Amino acid sequence: MSSSTSCPIPGCRDQLPDGYSTTPGGTLYATTPGGTRIIYDRKFLLECKNSPIARTPPCCLPQIPGVTTLPAVPPSKLELLKEQKQTEVEITDDEQFEMDM
């Protein structure tokens, strides 16, 4: 019988190091779920960033006011500054239950 130890898999992006799957030259390595290795060169990635397709918003986005579309009427500054009234619940000194002695 052989014993093996397990290594926890990072589940959150915060746990991964900054230079994960990169080289000092800026080349980025990735794999697909099928196992195909993909190599992205730094120059190619910078060209993709400045391409017209990268600057075009995606089609068929849902209409969410304030997120994907501008709101029809911007909220007035007074509405933003208004404080919400909070209802205060009176705390009574009554006993919560009766105690037999």
Swiss-Prot record:
Belongs to the eIF4E-binding protein family. Residues 1-28 are annotated as: Disordered. It comes from the Eukaryota. The lineage of its organism: Eukaryota, Metazoa, Chordata, Craniata, Vertebrata. Its main location: cytoplasm. A motif (TOS motif) lies at residues 97-101. This is Eukaryotic translation initiation factor 4E-binding protein 3. The keyword Nucleus applies. A motif (YXXXXLphi motif) lies at residues 40-46. Phosphorylated. Repressor of translation initiation that regulates EIF4E activity by preventing its assembly into the eIF4F complex: the hypophosphorylated form competes with EIF4G1/EIF4G3 and strongly binds to EIF4E, leading to repression of translation. In contrast, the hyperphosphorylated form dissociates from EIF4E, allowing interaction between EIF4G1/EIF4G3 and EIF4E, leading to initiation of translation. Inhibits EIF4E-mediated mRNA nuclear export. It is found in: Cytoplasm; Nucleus. Interacts with EIF4E. Interacts with RPA2 (via N-terminus); the interaction enhances EIF4EBP3-mediated inhibition of EIF4E-mediated mRNA nuclear export. Keywords: Cytoplasm, Nucleus, Phosphoprotein, Protein synthesis inhibitor, Translation regulation. InterPro entries: EIF4EBP. One of its GO terms (biological process) is negative regulation of translational initiation. The keyword Cytoplasm applies. It holds the Pfam family eIF_4EBP. One of its GO terms (cellular component) is nucleus. GO terms for molecular function: eukaryotic initiation factor 4E binding. It comes from Mus musculus.
